[in-house]
Each structure stands twice: as structure tokens, then as C-alpha cells.
């Protein structure tokens, strides 16, 4: 897509990155200027690679690029492989929910409408964007995954059947924009 943008003389390439690029940083909140050279998953490495490619295209071809690091997006029409949908489905079906790091995970959940608003603003403000830019797109309000599950339980009026497991390789313990 970025190469097509260059060939079709698109003036501003906006792309989705991810909070996963931060890995398991201890210092929070995450800042766009933090070092992201040590991804802990292949997904994070692919997002970091996209950022590097965008930076290089921006430099070589004078193409404005803006990367948006999304933090745990949720809402209607979301991906069915993401925690909110998995948790709801499994609670409703009486199935076990696997909760990693023994329940000590935190996520900076971001509602999809907020993501759409930011994307629209970045596109509309293209003339005022610098050559290469990265933005964190989150709420700056990490929520414990167990609190999130308890909220779902309250809404559904049904208790979750939880299986606590250790952290998996590549899992990020906390995200915080």
C-alpha cells in the first residue's frame, strides 16, 4: 500500500500500528518517543517493521506518513478473536475463560468510535502533519483484565468460569497510552 501511495502521488499515508511495539516496558505511560527496538512477539515485530518502512519511505520519497499505535480496540464489528468477544461468548456458553498471568494483566481499552474520530482528524489535518509522525491512540486509563471480566459478568448477569494460567511467551502484561 505504501508503495502504491508513492506511485499514485498520495500526499499523506496513514496506517495502523499497535501498542504491541512497546513490549513489556515497565515505565508507563508509554510515549511515542520510547524505545521500541525490542518486540516480544512476531506481531509486534511486524508492526515495528511497518513503522520503519514508513519512516524510510517518508525520507526517500518525501511522502508524509502517520502511524497510529492503537491500544486494545473494542466495539461493534470488532474482531471475534479479541478478548471482549471471546469473554462474552464463553460466559454466555458456560465455557472456561483462559486468563493469563494469573489475572494480573492490564489493558488500555479504546472504543472504536474514538479510533475513527482520531483517524478522521489526522486525515483532515494532513496539511499540518510533519513528514513522519507516530501517535499513541488510547484512553490513558489501563483496566485490570479481571475488572473487565467482572463488568461483563454484571452486564450479562452470569458468572465467568475462569482458568488462571501463567503468562505466555509474547504476552504484554500492561498497555498504557
Give each language-model segment a name:
Residues 18:
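Residue(s) in the substrate-gating loop at a strand-loop-helix junction
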Residues 72, 76, 105-107:
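Heptad-repeat alpha-helical coiled-coil signaling segments
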Residues 91-177:
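C-terminal substrate-binding subdomain of Rossmann-fold SDR/epimerase-dehydratase oxidoreductases
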Residues 4, 8, 25, 60, ...:
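Generic structural signal for alpha-helix termini and adjacent loop/cap motifs
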Residues 1-4, 151:
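Short, conserved SAM-binding segment of the class I
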Residues 3, 7, 11-12, 21-67, ...:
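Catalytic helix-loop patch of NAD(P)-dependent Rossmann-fold dehydrogenases
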Residues 48-55, 85-88, 116-117:
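Conserved active-site helix of classical SDR/Rossmann-fold NAD(P)-dependent CH-OH oxidoreductases
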